[in-house]
C-alpha cells in the first residue's frame, strides 16, 4: 500500500523498550521517510550501549537524524531540539519524504506541538555559577530557594530534578522574571497536521524487556563505555548526560558508592520508573492510534486515513 505524504508529521511514541525504532525502520524499508530521533539520551556521542542506540550499520542504512549531535558535556535544550527537528521536517517535505519523529522524550514532543516560551539563553558564566551552587548546596536546598522565588515552578519540578531546578533559578537570575511568568505565551513549532502513533505493550512485557536489555548491555561492554566517559575531566554526575538511567548508577558504582549487584538492581528499577513516567504521559495524549505490537500495515492504514 502506498503512503500519503500530504505534509503530515508522524509522531511515533512509546515507552522505553516498546519497539519504536524497529517499527520506524520497517516503515523506512517500504517508504520514503526521514527518521528524526526524539530522545534526549541519543543526542550524545560516545553513549551508545547504555542508550540502546541503533548500531552504526543500521544508522548508515537507515539514517536517524538528531542522533550523535552533542558531546556529553554539551548543553542541549528543548529549544535546541525544536529548532533542529523543525529544520529536519522542512527538509523532509522538500525531499517528498514522510517525517517520522520517533522516541520517548515527552518534553521534546510537547515542545514541537505546543511551543516553548522565549527564555534567556544560558551563558558559560551562569552555567558555571549554578553548577557550583548545585555542588555546594544540593538539589533539595536549591529547590527550597526556588520555592521562595517561584512557588508555581517549584510545585511542578521534582526536588531531585537538578537540571530543571537550576535552569529555573538561572532564568530568574538572568532576566529578573520567574520561569512561570515567562512561560505564559507559547506558539506551536509545527504548522502541519500531526498524526500520533503510540506503541504500548503490556507493562509486564516492558518490565521483562527492560531487565533483559540491561543485562545484555552489561554483557556487551556497558561498563567499559562508562569507564571511557569517566576519563573525560569535563564530565560529572550532575550533568544531564550522566544522569541518564543506567549511566548514573554505573557512575556511582565506578566511584565506589554502590556495589555491582546494587548498581544493576538500581539501574533496572530506574528504567522501570522512567517507563512508568512515559506511560503516564502517553495515557494523557489525545487523538492517538495505539498499538500493542508493531504493525507496519496498521500504521500505514492509519496514516492514510
From Swiss-Prot:
It catalyses: adenosine(37) in tRNA + dimethylallyl diphosphate = N(6)-dimethylallyladenosine(37) in tRNA + diphosphate. Disulfide bonds: none annotated. Catalyzes the transfer of a dimethylallyl group onto the adenine at position 37 in tRNAs that read codons beginning with uridine, leading to the formation of N6-(dimethylallyl)adenosine (i(6)A). The record marks 105 as: Interaction with substrate tRNA. This is tRNA dimethylallyltransferase. It is an enzyme of class 2 (transferase). Keywords: ATP-binding, Magnesium, Nucleotide-binding, Transferase, tRNA processing. Monomer. GO terms for biological process: tRNA modification. Its EC number is 2.5.1.75. ATP binds at residues 14-21. GO terms for molecular function: ATP binding; tRNA dimethylallyltransferase activity. InterPro entries: Dimethylallyltransferase, IPT, P-loop_NTPase. It comes from Ruthia magnifica subsp. Calyptogena magnifica. The keyword Protein biosynthesis does not apply.
